[in-house]
Amino acid sequence: MAKITRTNPEGISKPFSNYSHVVTAEGAQKLVFCAGQVGADVDGKVLPPDDFDAQAKMVMANLTKALAAGGAKIADVTKITIFICNPHDVPKARGILPTYFAGAAPASTLCILRGLANPNFLLEIEAIAAV
């Protein structure tokens, strides 16, 4: 099991949301890289394109399953990247971290893009975990 340390160094602004500026993993025997997960169910059906919260819940369920397939769990995540298309969804996107990563805030990047692979996707999240 990796020893994961999360730090917010002095001299850098406080995080704007529930994330850590620096995450180190010592003694990691395995890194798990999860491709971007989206708001689609097991059959590939995209959840309603106007329901960010429903898609976010599905994204996190999919991410949890992907991590488990690699032998990791949410608490092992050291870095996530969140991709969204609508700047108005920034507060909701930032809300994902305290909801799902409480007490284990990973290093995080939030990107606003012109679009994702399917125009009905409202967000996509990729992750790296250390176990």
Language-model segments: what does each one mean?
Residues 1-61, 65-78, 84-131:
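N-terminal presequence-like segments and the immediate start of the first folded domain
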